[in-house]
Design a protein with these regions (language model features):
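Hydrophobic anchor residue at the start of the ABC signature
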Residues: 153
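A short, proline-enriched helix->beta-strand linker immediately N-terminal to the Walker B motif
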Residues: 158-162
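Walker A (P-loop) phosphate-binding loop of ABC-type ATPase nucleotide-binding domains
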Residues: 45-49
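Conserved ABC transporter NBD signature motif
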Residues: 66-77, 81-82
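Conserved ABC ATPase "signature" region
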Residues: 106, 110, 117-135
Length: 172
């Protein structure tokens, strides 16, 4: 694929997305595209399916029907490939309370296949970016909810994803 065609393809494409939980319809026939390099927000009332849609794009739940492409990768058929380019931050910071902040970030950097030297460098860079460098040795359980959310953002950035999916990023 030439560079020009690559830059005009949408970074995220959801086509006729439907997600059901039993008889409950969480998402009904949602279609949209997100251009490369843009910021896109899902806005709606509680229960509208925003989090469910984000989780489907992040490969965490499987839609009942429809197609999702992330950087032209079909996430339903190649979730492991898609996960390498997606950074997902949920709405509530699930951190490992007994880990230090830098260990928490390092754990995810390791899971994404970064070697030891690259992990150390990326963890420091992400902690600096999220203003947590001075908390690097603090146990996650000692952090405020807002700081836990920043630690989660650092973890989300550590593998340099080309797509960020942030659920309620400004909640704290």
């Amino acid at each position: 694929m030439n560079t020009d065609a690559h830059t005009i393809l949408p970074m995220i494409k959801c086509q006729d997305l439907k997600i059901h939980y039993g008889d409950h319809v969480a998402v009904d026939s949602l279609s949209f595209e997100v251009k490369r390099g843009s910021v896109y927000g899902l806005i709606g009332p509680n229960g509208a399916g925003k989090t469910t849609t984000i989780k489907a794009i992040a490969t965490l739940i499987e839609p009942t029907y429809g197609e999702i492409l992330v950087d032209h990768i079909p996430v339903l058929h190649q979730p492991e490939v898609a996960r390498k380019i997606i950074g997902y931050m949920p709405d509530f910071p699930p951190v490992y309370d007994e880990l230090r902040v830098e260990e928490f970030c390092d754990l995810f950097a390791h899971a994404y296949g970064l070697d030891r030297d690259a992990r150390a460098k990326k963890v420091e860079e992400c902690l600096r970016l999220t203003d947590l460098l001075d908390k690097r040795r603090a146990l996650c359980k000692t952090l405020s909810r807002g700081m836990k959310q920043r630690a989660l953002l650092a973890k989300t950035l550590v593998h340099e994803p080309s797509v960020l999916l942030l659920d309620e990023p400004a909640a704290n």
